Every structure is written in C-alpha cells, then in structure tokens.
C-alpha cells in the first residue's frame, strides 16, 4: 500500500515536472521521508491487518482508535497534497483501475487495489456489504488474552521460585565444599596424630625393654614390672603397674591417651 502511494506521487511528479533527474530525486526523498517517519510501516501494517485479521493483535480499544485516527489524518494529508498537484478524486479513483483481458478477447476493467475492488462491487451490486467481525470474536480474544496473562503471571512466579531454589542449592554447595575442606583437614590431622602415636608407642616399648618392664598396648597402654623378678612372700603373684613422673604427678594417664588416637 505504501508503495502504491509512492508510485502515485512519482507518476504525478513526472507528469507535472517532467521525467528528469530532479523528479526522480524528489520521489526518492519522499520514499525516504515516509520510511523515516514511520508512515510507510504504518500503512503496510494496517493494510496487512485489514486483509488478514481485520483488527491488529495486542491492541487495546483506545490504541486502535488512536491508530485509526492517525492513519486517517495521514491519508487525508496525502490526498490534500495530491489535490494541490491536480490529483483529484476522479484521477485517484481511475488510477486504481487497469485495463485487462478476460482470456476470451474481451477488454475488462481490473481493480488494482482493495478499495477499487469494493468500488467495482458497488457499481453493479447495491446490496454489497463488507463482512463484519464474527460475533464473539473480540470477547473470545479478550478472554484468551486474560488467560495468557494469568499463565504468564504463574510462569513468572515459578521462575522466581526456581531462582530462589537455585540460590539455596548454591548455598548448600558452598557449605558442602567448606565441610569437605574441614574433613580433609581433620583427616590429615588424624593421620599425623596416628604417626605420632605409633612413634611414641615404639619409643615407650624401647624404654620398657631397656629398663626391664613389660608394656601392653591394646586399647590402652599398661606398663608393669617384668615377670622375671621373684615372687614376694605372703603376697599373690601379680604384676604391679608402674607409675612415672615425680611424686604426685602421674604420667600413666597421659601415656594412655596416646592409644586413643584413631
């Protein structure tokens, strides 16, 4: 549709000022101007809406009214400018028709625009009417739009919940990494303490052998006198546990703790 407007203006310019470079330059500037201002796109969009949908999608009633009003003003302005150049209603109407052949050798008038097709229908059919919007279509579209809005709100809520869940899982992951680091450190410390325990037990056994004592290492450490010593009269034959350290300071308990390292 916008190209038809450009072609009409180009035809008028060539007929008025001649087919020269200045006329061609003016037509190019006009096409650039309507593209830059958005008029070109508006005309094409409304033409597509009229042919395919009758009403554009995703427009409120007020937006449709404003767009129709703007389109009407733009068309009237173009018609007014064309009229000043001698492009009257008669010329505009006749320019929308072309001569053609019906295939049987008969010359016929062929409409080139949607409006010219309507004019031709009105010429021989007085009862001709444009099809109306199907009953209930607007209400159905509005209901579907509301349902889509509800679904969109639900999806937004779900996305927000998923974002919170992801954030919580990331926190759990960080805590797990920190716990893993602590466990690795404790494992290393435990291994070091086991080595120290084994070394201390070896040293203790060596000392016991040196001084003729017996050292029993199980879940705990017990150091007793050797069985090689003679029995004492009047007493049962039992081992006497040996205490270490200065008087009042018993090291046996401290030595026993060496076997508690797991």
From Swiss-Prot:
<dbReference type="GO" id="GO:0003723">
    <property type="term" value="F:RNA binding"/>
</dbReference>
<feature type="region of interest" description="Disordered">
    <location>
        <begin position="224"/>
        <end position="248"/>
    </location>
</feature>
<keyword id="KW-1035">Host cytoplasm</keyword>
<comment type="similarity">
    <text>Belongs to the rotavirus NSP3 family.</text>
</comment>
<comment type="function">
    <text>May play a role in stimulating the translation of viral mRNAs.</text>
</comment>
<dbReference type="InterPro" id="IPR002873">
    <property type="entry name" value="Rotavirus_NSP3"/>
</dbReference>
<dbReference type="GO" id="GO:0006417">
    <property type="term" value="P:regulation of translation"/>
</dbReference>
<feature type="coiled-coil region">
    <location>
        <begin position="138"/>
        <end position="179"/>
    </location>
</feature>
<keyword id="KW-0694">RNA-binding</keyword>
<feature type="compositionally biased region" description="Basic residues">
    <location>
        <begin position="229"/>
        <end position="238"/>
    </location>
</feature>
<protein>
    <recommendedName>
        <fullName>Non-structural protein 3</fullName>
    </recommendedName>
</protein>
<keyword id="KW-0810">Translation regulation</keyword>
<keyword id="KW-0175">Coiled coil</keyword>
<dbReference type="GO" id="GO:0030430">
    <property type="term" value="C:host cell cytoplasm"/>
</dbReference>
């Amino acid at each position: 549709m916008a190209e038809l407007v450009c072609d009409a203006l180009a035809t008028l310019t060539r007929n008025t000022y001649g087919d020269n470079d200045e006329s061609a330059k003016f037509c190019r500037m006009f096409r650039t101007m309507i593209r830059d201002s958005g008029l070109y796109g508006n005309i094409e969009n409304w033409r597509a809406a009229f042919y395919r949908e009758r009403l554009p999608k995703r427009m409120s009633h007020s937006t449709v009214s404003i767009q129709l009003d703007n389109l009407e003003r733009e068309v009237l302005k173009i018609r007014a400018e064309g009229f000043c150049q001698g492009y009257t209603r008669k010329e505009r109407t006749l320019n929308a028709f072309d001569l053609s052949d019906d295939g049987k050798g008969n010359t016929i008038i062929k409409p080139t625009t949607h409006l010219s097709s309507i004019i031709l229908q009105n010429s021989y059919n007085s009862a001709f009417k444009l099809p109306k919007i199907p009953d209930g279509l607007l209400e159905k579209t509005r209901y579907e739009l509301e349902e889509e809005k509800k679904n969109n709100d639900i999806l937004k809520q779900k996305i927000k919940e998923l974002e919170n869940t992801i954030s919580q899982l990331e926190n759990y992951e960080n805590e797990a990494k920190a716990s893993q680091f602590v466990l690795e450190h404790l494992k290393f410390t435990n291994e070091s303490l086991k080595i120290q325990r084994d070394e201390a037990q070896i040293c203790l056994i060596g000392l016991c052998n040196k001084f003729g004592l017996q050292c029993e290492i199980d879940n705990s450490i017990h150091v007793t006198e050797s069985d090689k010593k003679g029995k004492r009269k009047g007493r049962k034959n039992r081992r006497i546990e040996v205490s270490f350290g200065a008087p009042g300071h018993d090291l046996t308990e401290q030595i026993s703790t060496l076997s508690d390292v797991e």
